[in-house]
């Protein structure tokens, strides 16, 4: 039900509680200590959030469906919810514009919100509130295990920021995967070395467990219809939409992952197999990033599965590290470095994003598969993002801001606080090593080792020149040549740069011309 259908005589509004599309937890700090008789929840669907980047239709549908289910759940609890639907008459189609309309109509004494997950949105709402002359209280997001202040304290005085030290600190603080003496289970903090398996020539097992799917209910079906109508030119297959959009369904998805895929997740988390988008991955990032799932319950479920013998330690630790370590770490980086972080471009990359990133039409089998499932489903797992789509853009020298905007647009789990550092820093090395200690670059042989993509591809990963040369391999050697002076200063790149000496002047020229 829209805001227009809710209008009528009501009690004076004390506080307008702003709820954004990635803040769908009932225990959000904005709702704490609220008076349901005098406070009002405000939510708005606006085209701006799907058009500031060319958002995929599955991504837009996920946000709107989850928002509407949150609205209905709060109303069932007795909250008054002022909800602006995408097709409401008079919708200004911007968050700032809809906030102005709500304040002018409801006249709240003040505004309260949980800190936004996007700097652009935070600035827009802050500016709108200031222009209206209404106080805005911004509260810490309690969903996370590390506050922005705690991350600032962690980073203070350090010459370098590295995930591993941060991760160990949080393991100790929250007593996760520790023994009675406070030491890491298994005698080591990190089992990454055990988690790099591929499927070999045989591929994944025939009984590979499919993730639990969630058929759209009436609310979600209406959203799918609306998104198809309003965003016909945007990418994405709405017929395949099956994401959890409520906390109940998100918990079922978590239970399904823990029972059926986490036991093999660690070993195969970096593996790729054409036509198999899910493999042993959790599909939980979107639910967590919209706050349908609390990371504490996800971590607790994985740890419990290890302690009672259902999951080995490398799988449990590898999965927990992605959440407790990487997810919290990138958020800290984002808020510490914004707003200038999006413009970082350490390598001076200025190429345009290839058009096939929006069509999936390329002869490179690995890219065709990763892009195809991304554009269709709004999903690719982390190695496809880092070492296929991200690697190609890095080697080609695509402008990092363009790569960032593509990642933010196409993936259903993309919220800027988590997507931008992963793209700008980890994938594109545009921050010069703030996020990652070296650029993650490789020839096509890496993809050959971790997938079956090369077997049916017309390009040869072991060739760098000639008509059959793999573009990844050619661009790898070109990348090393272009950035040789910079990379020489990085000890972790020493061996790769040294290998340039194996190329004759003629080979170097051929690589550049290819």
Specify the residue positions occupied by each region the protein language model found:
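N-terminal beta-strand-loop-alpha-helix module at the start
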Residues: 2-86
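Substrate/cofactor-recognition hotspot
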Residues: 14-30, 57, 185-312, 482-514
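Short His-Asn-centered micro-motif
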Residues: 18-21, 44-45, 84-86, 113-116, ...
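Gly/Ser/Thr-rich loops at beta-strand to alpha-helix junctions
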Residues: 23-25, 90, 115-123, 394
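A short acidic (Asp/Glu
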Residues: 27-31, 53-55, 93-96, 121-126, ...
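Beta-rich, aromatic/charged-enriched effector core domains that present basic-aromatic interfaces
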Residues: 94-243, 424
């Amino acid at each position: 039900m829209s805001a227009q259908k809710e209008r009528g005589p009501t009690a004076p509004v004390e506080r307008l509680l702003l709820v954004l599309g990635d803040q769908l937890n009932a225990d959000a700090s904005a709702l704490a200590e609220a008076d349901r008789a005098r406070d009002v929840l405000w939510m708005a669907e606006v085209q701006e959030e799907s058009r500031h980047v060319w958002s995929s239709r599955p991504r837009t549908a996920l946000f709107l469906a989850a928002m509407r289910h949150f609205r209905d759940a709060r109303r069932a609890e007795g909250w008054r919810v002022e909800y602006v639907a995408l097709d409401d008459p008079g919708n200004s189609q911007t968050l700032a514009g809809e906030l102005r309309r709500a304040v002018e109509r409801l006249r709240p004494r003040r505004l309260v919100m949980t800190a936004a997950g996007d700097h652009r949105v935070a600035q827009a709402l802050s500016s709108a509130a200031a222009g209206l002359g209404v106080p805005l209280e911004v509260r810490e997001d309690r969903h996370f295990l590390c506050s922005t202040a705690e991350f600032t304290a962690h980073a203070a005085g350090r010459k370098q920021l590295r995930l591993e030290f941060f991760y160990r600190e949080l393991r100790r603080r929250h007593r996760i995967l520790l023994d009675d003496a406070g030491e890491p289970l298994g005698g080591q903090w990190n089992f990454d070395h055990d988690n790099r398996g591929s499927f070999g020539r045989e591929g994944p097992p025939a009984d590979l467990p499919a993730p639990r799917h969630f058929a759209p209910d009436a609310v979600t079906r209406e959203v799918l219809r609306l998104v198809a109508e309003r965003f016909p030119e945007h990418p994405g297959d709405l017929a395949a939409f099956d994401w959890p959009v409520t906390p109940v369904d998100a918990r079922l998805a978590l239970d399904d992952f823990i029972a059926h895929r986490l036991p093999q997740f660690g070993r195969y988390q970096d593996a790729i197999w054409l036509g198999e988008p899910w493999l042993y991955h959790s599909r939980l990032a979107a639910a967590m990033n919209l706050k349908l799932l609390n990371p504490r319950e996800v971590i607790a479920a994985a740890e419990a599965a290890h302690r009672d013998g259902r999951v080995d330690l490398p799988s449990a630790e590898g999965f927990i590290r992605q959440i407790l370590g990487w997810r919290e770490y990138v958020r800290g980086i984002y808020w510490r470095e914004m707003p200038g972080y999006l413009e970082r471009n350490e390598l001076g990359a200025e190429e345009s994003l290839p058009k096939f990133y929006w069509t999936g039409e390329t002869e490179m089998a690995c890219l065709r598969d990763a892009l195809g499932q991304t554009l269709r489903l709004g999903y690719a797992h982390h190695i496809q993002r880092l070492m296929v789509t991200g690697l190609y853009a890095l080697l080609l020298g695509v402008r990092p801001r363009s790569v960032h905007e593509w990642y933010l647009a196409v993936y259903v789990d993309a919220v800027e606080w988590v997507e931008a550092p992963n793209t700008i820093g980890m994938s594109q090395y545009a921050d010069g090593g703030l996020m990652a200690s070296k650029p993650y670059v490789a020839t096509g042989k890496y993809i050959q080792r971790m997938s079956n993509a090369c077997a049916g591809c017309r390009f040869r990963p072991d060739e760098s020149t000639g008509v059959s040369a793999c573009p990844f391999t050619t661009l790898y050697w070109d990348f090393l040549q272009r950035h040789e002076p910079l990379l020489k200063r990085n000890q972790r790149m020493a061996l790769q740069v040294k290998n340039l000496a194996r190329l004759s002047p003629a080979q170097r020229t051929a690589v550049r011309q290819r």
